Amino acid sequence: MKRSLLRITFWGTLLPFASCSVMKDSAKSTSDNFPKLSLEAHRGGRGLYPEESIAAMKNAIDFAKVTTLEMDCHITKDRKVVVFHDDYLNPKFVLKPNGTEISDKDKPLRIYDMLYKDLVKYDIGSKFYKEFPEQKKQVTRIAKLADLIDSTEAYANLKRKAPMFYNIEVKSKEDKDGIFHPRVEEFVDLMVQVITDKKIAARTVIQSFDSRAINYLHKAYPQIKVSYLIDANHTKSVEQTIAALGFTPFIISPHYKIVTSDYVKQCHKAGIKVIPWTVNTKEEIEQLKAVKVDGIISDYPNLF
């Protein structure tokens, strides 16, 4: 991938320091082994608590079998890395600062257009969310990635003998640079800076559907593990996927419906781990374990 002038100029000072931090953190933490079976709370376990919230992450930590906290990141107008899935504030579960609902008449509230000081006023946890009726309702704010990591690391230190792992998604799209997010290189640089500052790089996988993000990570931050997300419509073989990417990712994370025993064997033969998403029944979780997947992502960490 051709590297942008952005990295050479404005980000030129950030990237060398970030890369050094990654290497130092990784070298210092070589004893941190990736979980044999990575059991991941999707968006913190949104079946039980408001998605992407600090409360959800802490609840997931309370389940002994959960090894990994899965989450998504966006960038605000003032370049804060925040933990949220959607490009816009979702009317299905977000309330305005005054407690009223976002209506169809309201202008769409795009994360990338908002300052964090304004974004944090919205409540993402009090409104009943019919897709996840078991979700515990409470006033919840969108967290900065740095603050969420501080909270989860402190909580895990109290509750666990071993630290948590993280699976963090770059929510970029190939045709949306400058619309839903900054240039993908800047997006990744901002995320990696937080991860290295918080000294969790050795315990973090960065994932994305966007092959540009995965390729940039592989080239600019080779010490960080990457996961390539693929959806249910993906038809390429494992070999074709590797060829299209141009390198072998640490993980391929497919929609669980396309995972077969043969697919897992092909990935393992290529040295790739398989961690499917999003698996929300006990029966399907056990079926996937039976075909030797390397992890499972679920909205319901209580099912593990």
Which residues are covered by each model-predicted region?
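Bacterial Sec-dependent N-terminal signal peptides
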Residues: 1-32
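Phosphate-group recognition and catalysis centered on beta-loop-alpha active-site segments
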Residues: 20-304
